[in-house]
């Protein structure tokens, strides 16, 4: 079976390509192409192809944070001791003690828990994503690390990644990708070298 399957690689790859736009399962696809279902399923798994399913989002913050830094306009979710995500709904910048930008979103990881902001696609189609992060508490700390990820039901792919020092930041230039309904695009921020001190971070993602 091994040698026979290798000899039919081109036919298996044709079936895999068809799976990207076909809701048929591996058994029906294999039957359609005269292939072994188990072997085709292995190809689909290896290449992360197959019918798309909505991504189940876990680890959501459940505790509200209100009047962060004493401001009525800075509120969010998380834990006072981190991790957390907050938004400033006003046209003024506030110290919380890092800088909460006007109309901005700030995130703060813990030493072991990263924090993310994301978007779950309501469509099947093409999108363009870009992102920026910047140190929001540049007077201290050692910087941070960031990722922009495309999370589907079959894989998590990195669209961009970077590490920055104190007062620094990072940017993902516009990237175009195909998404399915239920896929998630997220901006993730973590501590640099496990140190989360002063890691309040400006988080911007545009889709």
Segment roles from a protein language model:
Residues 1-207:
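Low-complexity, glycine/serine/threonine/alanine-rich intrinsically disordered linker
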């Amino acid at each position: 079976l091994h040698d026979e399957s290798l000899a039919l690689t081109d036919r298996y790859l044709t079936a895999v390509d068809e799976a990207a736009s076909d809701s048929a399962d591996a058994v029906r696809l294999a039957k359609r192409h005269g292939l072994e279902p188990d072997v085709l399923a292995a190809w689909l798994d290896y290449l992360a192809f197959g019918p798309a399913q909505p991504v189940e989002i876990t680890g959501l913050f459940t505790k509200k944070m209100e009047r962060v830094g004493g401001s009525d306009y800075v509120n969010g979710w998380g834990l006072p001791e981190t991790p957390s995500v907050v938004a400033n709904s006003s046209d003024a910048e506030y110290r919380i003690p890092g800088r909460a930008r006007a109309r901005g979103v700030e995130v703060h990881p813990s030493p072991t828990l990263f924090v993310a902001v994301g978007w779950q696609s309501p469509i099947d189609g093409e999108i363009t994503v870009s992102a920026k992060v910047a140190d929001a508490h540049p007077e201290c700390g050692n910087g941070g690390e960031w990722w922009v990820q495309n999370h589907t039901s079959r894989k998590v792919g990195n669209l961009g990644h970077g590490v920055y020092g104190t007062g620094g930041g990072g940017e993902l230039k516009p990237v175009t990708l195909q998404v399915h309904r239920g896929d998630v695009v997220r901006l993730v921020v973590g501590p640099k070298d496990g140190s989360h001190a002063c890691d309040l971070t400006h988080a911007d993602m545009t889709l």
